[in-house]
């Protein structure tokens, strides 16, 4: 994808989510499944990486659902997104919740170029399937991590089951999320994500499935990664 096409694609994604920002914190609105998934995402991160007093960056933070949860676990949280309305919603909600979170309107690539002090943990949830270059996002995430730091990614697998459940079912039949939220061709299989991550200097530690039940509006971690999944990577430590 050339730079002009990539920019256009990213702009379209930003506009798509900006238009939904006012619904972000409504657990019955357009982000209803995300609210159900969030406790399991937080549990996965907290079980695999100590959070208290550690510097954490949430990339593609949206309205701040994950960022706030991680801040409540004691992490010093910074969070970035390219959607202006989402950042404003996140800042307002954090203020109302009396949480200290540093929200910035930046991409991971922009933030990495500004050379901040490296983070202990970087989270990138439900984002990589929306960016024009997953490889570039992973490379930026590595630059933002200290050696030995943890990266957590959640996304949707590219399988027939994920197409039927996460796209046809969730977007068109049950209308849990807006139509057009996901493009099947842009989804990554775990092996593809692991290969890109390895090229960026990351080691795969774990892949776990994240199952959502739309009828009970509940989620659980599972060994089945055929639809939603979480992946834990670690930045390779520098040689002594």
Regions found by a protein language model. Give the residues of each.
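N-terminal, positively charged/glycine-rich alpha-helical extensions of SAM-dependent methyltransferases
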Residues: 1-25
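Conserved alpha-helix/loop element of class I SAM-dependent methyltransferases that forms part
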Residues: 35-52
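Conserved class I S-adenosyl-L-methionine
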Residues: 54-60, 152-174
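Class I SAM-dependent methyltransferase SAM/SAH-binding core
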Residues: 65-110
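A short acidic, Gly/Pro-enriched loop at the edge of an enzyme's catalytic core
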Residues: 112-121
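A short glycine-rich, Lys/Arg-flanked "PGG" loop and its adjoining helix->strand segment in the class I
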Residues: 135-147
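Acceptor-substrate binding/catalytic loop of class I
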Residues: 175-192
